[in-house]
Curated annotation (Swiss-Prot):
Keywords: Host membrane, Membrane, Transmembrane, Transmembrane helix. It is a multi-pass membrane protein. The chain crosses the membrane at residues 11-31, 33-53, 69-89. This is Putative transmembrane protein ORF108. GO terms for cellular component: host cell membrane; membrane. It is found in: Host membrane.
Amino acid sequence: MEQRFTHEDRFIMGLFPLLAVILISSNSSIIDIAMTVIIFGWIIYETLITVHFCKNYIETVESIMLGFVGFLGVLCLDKFPFGIILLIIYVIEGIYINVKTLKYARSC
């Protein structure tokens, strides 16, 4: 079961930059509200799955922060160096969390 939760978490986390692009490309308040609901839904989902079932508090905080870094990276793409740097951090941290999660998946 821990493998299913791990891959779902990574998949959902990977959707944040895509959703940020949608937010940037449309100036609609409905999209803004939807993004806020998705962010809070992600935090609740990550907290329930990772903390309650797996007791991985550090990975939970890292995953939530990584989602925000990717989100902010796409939002800042028009400010040249900051958006690119945030997206590079997002990719490196994402690989690190995936490797660490797979390494310790049996402890979940």
